[in-house]
A protein has these predicted regions:
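Active-site entrance/lid segments in N-terminal catalytic domains of soluble metabolic enzymes
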Residues: 1-171
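Conserved active-site-proximal phosphate/metal-binding subdomains
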Residues: 124-179, 185-321
Length: 321
């Protein structure tokens, strides 16, 4: 990976898809691919060729995603790999404005709409589709988010996105499911989203601290050890704010000038002279269990994890069973 990142990532797409399909023969298997990634189009097309059921894409606006789907379909057809492609495509949006850009562009340029829309809110983990100022206005950049979050304001944004998606669904005489994400931890959270009009929810943080999660034990324990004061908003080289667990790594960011020793060619836009750290190196370190030397992304409720659970336990909790 270090020396041949692109080739390694392309191989990993097929490898991980095969592994997931063996675990869930009848399951829906998707890839989350960041628009900000270098070689984005190649990764999208490789996932389609691998057999992905859905591609979810954010960290930027996936305005050209339908084009890459069409290109992959044409390449597969010419190679004798089938006449049709089953892969669905879904943009991640965080505001009515970003949803409008995607829907209008896909409608005008490609004559289609998304198969699914994911609304990722300000309580999500990892990269956030909000400016730092917007996060402050929403009251989600404090340790006491449960009391400072202006939920009513963002709930109205969600309703607005759902209304907008509905207009395009009506135009195309189809159903476009809307899934909400970010800070969903309990059955009550799930039901609140359904009451807002969501067709489903996307949950990540709760599944990190499960037996089945393939993250290293030290990564899971970082969640369990964390307090709400440890969960902070940090600036990412991707150019977006991100939510993570404060640790020795983040304490050291900006303390001394950063010198890039090896470039993984991971981001389309990366100013190697000014970045505070290498995001790939930081994420790889934490994924390998070196959590004090890496970036540990998490949702706003990560501190609520008290023990390692099973996926079955988490699902029953979310469903209120």
């Amino acid at each position: 990976f270090a020396d041949h990142s692109l080739e390694a990532n392309l191989r990993a797409i097929g490898k991980e898809f095969k592994k997931a399909r063996e675990i869930a023969p009848e399951g829906v298997i998707g890839f989350n691919i960041m628009v900000a990634t270098k070689n984005y189009a190649m990764y999208v097309k490789e996932a389609i060729k691998a057999g992905a059921d859905i591609i979810i894409s954010g960290a930027g606006l996936p305005v050209s995603l339908p084009a890459y789907l069409a290109e992959a379909a044409a390449e597969m057809k010419s190679a004798g790999l089938g006449e049709t492609v089953k892969t669905k495509i879904a943009p991640i949006v965080s505001s009515v404005k970003s949803a409008m850009v995607i829907l209008k562009m896909w409608d005008r340029k490609f004559g289609r709409v998304p198969d699914l829309v994911v609304i990722e809110g300000p309580l999500a983990g990892g990269h956030l589709g909000f400016s730092r100022e917007s996060l402050t206005e929403l009251g989600v950049d404090t340790p006491d988010v449960e009391h400072t979050y202006h939920q009513d304001a963002y709930d109205e944004e969600i309703r607005g996105i759902i209304r907008l998606v509905g207009e395009y669904a009506e135009k195309y005489q189809t159903k476009i499911p809307v899934v909400t994400a970010g800070g969903i931890y309990s059955h009550e959270d799930v039901m609140h989203q359904i009451d807002l009009g969501a067709d489903g929810v996307q949950v990540a943080t709760r599944f990190v601290t499960t037996v089945e999660c393939d993250a290293p034990e030290e990564f899971k324990q970082a969640y369990i050890r964390s307090s709400k004061e440890d969960i902070v908003i940090t600036k990412s080289p991707v150019g977006m704010p991100g939510r993570a667990i404060h640790n020795a790594f983040l304490s050291g960011v900006g303390q001394t000038p950063f010198k890039l020793e090896h470039c993984y060619q991971c981001l389309e836009k990366c100013d190697k002279k000014t970045i505070p750290y290498c995001i790939t190196k930081a994420l790889v370190n934490s994924a390998e269990g070196h959590t004090e030397d890496g970036l540990v992304f998490c949702g706003s409720n990560a501190f609520r994890a008290e023990r390692i659970e099973t996926v079955d336990e988490v699902m029953k909790s979310l469903l209120g069973e």
